[in-house]
Amino acid sequence: MKRTAEIDRSTSETRIHLKLTIDGTGLSAIRTTVPFLDHMLHLFARHGLFDLTVEAQGDIDIDFHHTVEDIGIVLGEAFRQALGDKKGIVRYGTARIPMDETLADVTVDLSGRPYLVYNVDLPKVKVGEFDAELAREFFQAFANNCGCNLHLNLLYGENVHHIIEACFKGFGRSLDSATRQDARLHGVMSTKGVL
């Protein structure tokens, strides 16, 4: 059974079409009108080996906030839908990613309980036109709508682009690990019998 989801979401602030294949090869087609986010989502898909299509339009004449947050919402919903009852998945994933002077650790638990820990102090507030604080908004929206614990910890780093990039690569790799299916599992990875 293919683990896929396709979602269309329209609000007064954004219009988003997203298609996800969990068991992909890292192919992506991303057009969000936020170039730095496009770059991060390409990296996420490639390093997580997810096939991902995102087309988004938003009120970027105001700022990027609504577009970035709403894409996090839709991506989280897509993972939740594609994983279904989560039978057979490993559930946990972690990745420690270097990017030159930066080292970031990302851990996920597909528990059904949304929670974000974001220990990422950024040395400046912008990467080009992108407000660096929006990375946190994206991850919070994802965790809330996927229903997962998501922990991002920056061990060290100086370049804000490298820091956010290491976080997105680690996000992809940790989700790849957590969504893997293990033939030894019957049901879900929980003594409760449900995730």
Curated annotation (Swiss-Prot):
Main subcellular localisation: cytoplasm
Pathway in which this enzyme or protein is active: Amino-acid biosynthesis; L-histidine biosynthesis; L-histidine from 5-phospho-alpha-D-ribose 1-diphosphate: step 6/9
GO BP of this protein: L-histidine biosynthetic process
Domain of life: Bacteria
EC number(s) given by UniProt: 4.2.1.19
Protein's cellular compartments: Cytoplasm
GO CC terms of this entry: cytoplasm
MF terms (GO), sorted A to Z: imidazoleglycerol-phosphate dehydratase activity
Reactions it catalyzes: D-erythro-1-(imidazol-4-yl)glycerol 3-phosphate = 3-(imidazol-4-yl)-2-oxopropyl phosphate + H2O
EC main group: lyase
Keywords: Amino-acid biosynthesis, Cytoplasm, Histidine biosynthesis, Lyase
Entry similarity comment: Belongs to the imidazoleglycerol-phosphate dehydratase family.
Name this protein carries in UniProt: Imidazoleglycerol-phosphate dehydratase
Source species: Trichlorobacter lovleyi (strain ATCC BAA-1151 / DSM 17278 / SZ)
